[in-house]
Structures are given as structure tokens and as C-alpha cells.
Amino acid sequence: MTVPVLTDTHCHIDAYDNPVAVLEDAHRAGIHVIAVTEDPGKYRLLRTRLGRRDGLDVALGFHPLRAGNASPHDLARFLRLLPQATWIGEIGLDFSRAGVKTRKQQLRVFESILADPQVRTRPVTVHSRGAERETIAQLAQAQVSAILHWYTGPLAAVDDALAAGLWFSINPAMVRSTKAGPLLRRLPPERVLLETDGPFARSGSRSAVPSDLIGTLDHLARLWDISPGEARKAVAQNEQRLRYHSEHPPA
């Protein structure tokens, strides 16, 4: 029986010392990697650096902390590159202490990106730190079926996100965190996807890598009271549904 391929929906592959070795390890583990980027320039550089290879999609990103200081030229460049992107991310909002001063600029960029119809036809991975309610509201209004990456916001907003058709990606650091426990128990299994946010997220004492998602899946299997094989099949089916929703957006 074929083992379903899993997807690391949010990985900063360019931040590892040896990205190619990490990708090769992921391929052996049956993990497809979505390499998120922080701005259009980094997207073009990473595509050139890694080229076309099995098991990898480079996502077109505009991190909110970059977007807050962006020029109109940067936004125009992002929108110009959209047709060639298979995934979008990381985009979003950040109203934490690090980003609150650029709130208005971030909102302007995020709204401009979401207004482009092409965004509704791509899987999207979204940053929402300190701006969870605003991010969910913007995505719901735009009818974008996005993934909330490493969600740390109020549990009360989770139902709004689910009603908006959003997904949640879980990483190795989250399953080791007591703080994330209530979120994991609240999420319906059919809305859960996987991520590492590596190398920034940790897996024990080291940076997380895509192959660590096998352990994340084992934790979810115990939480859902099913076998690891059943959990892998369930998450793989979620990934297929995400792609279907992206390819067939609401009219």
C-alpha cells in the first residue's frame, strides 16, 4: 500500500545552513516542502537557487513585517509575480510589539493582495500574530481558503476561522507546548494541516526540519485516538481538500 505524501505547508528552507540536505531528508520521509518567502525578491532568488525539483514548491511571500515598510514598487512586483506562483506565503498581519507601528501599511498591503482574484486560486499560508481577529475577518471577506500558520490567538476566534473555511497548520513546537493544548483539542481533525516553521521552530533542542512532522503526526494520532497510519491518511486527505478548494473557489 502506498504511503500518502505529507506536506510541510510552511518552511523557511532558505534559512537552513544546507537547504538541499534538508530537502533530501524530507523527500526520504515522504514530505513535500512548501518553501515560504518573505518578499518578492527572496522568492525570485530562491526559485533561481533551488530550481525545479521534486518535493518542493517555492511560495511567493510578503511577510507583514516586510510589508509594513514596503514601497508601492514592492507591492506591484508581488502582484506581477502572482501568475507564476503555485503557493502564496507567508503573507498576513503582525500587530505584536514588533509590528504594531506599521499596522496601517500592513493592512493596505494585505488588502491589496487579497483583492487580486488569483489569490483565491492558490493555497495560502498566513501569519496572524497579535492580529488574529483582523486576519480572520480579512480572509473571510475575501473568501480566501487560507492556512493560519502557528496560531497563537484567542480560542474564541477559532470558531470564526472555521466558519470562514480556514485551516490550521501544526508544528513540532506546538505539540510540545502546554499553551497550544487547548487549541489542538478544539480543532476538528478535518481542518488540521502540518508545518515546521523551520528552522525558527524547535523540535526539542534543535531546529525543526520537515521530517520531524512524522513525530507531530504521531502526537495528533494519540490526540484523535487513531493509528499513525490513519492520521497520516486523514491529513493527506485534508491537503487534497485544501488544493481542491483553492482550485475551485466560491463563485
Predicted regions mapped to residue ranges:
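Mid-domain alpha/beta scaffold segments of enzyme catalytic cores
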Residues: 1-251
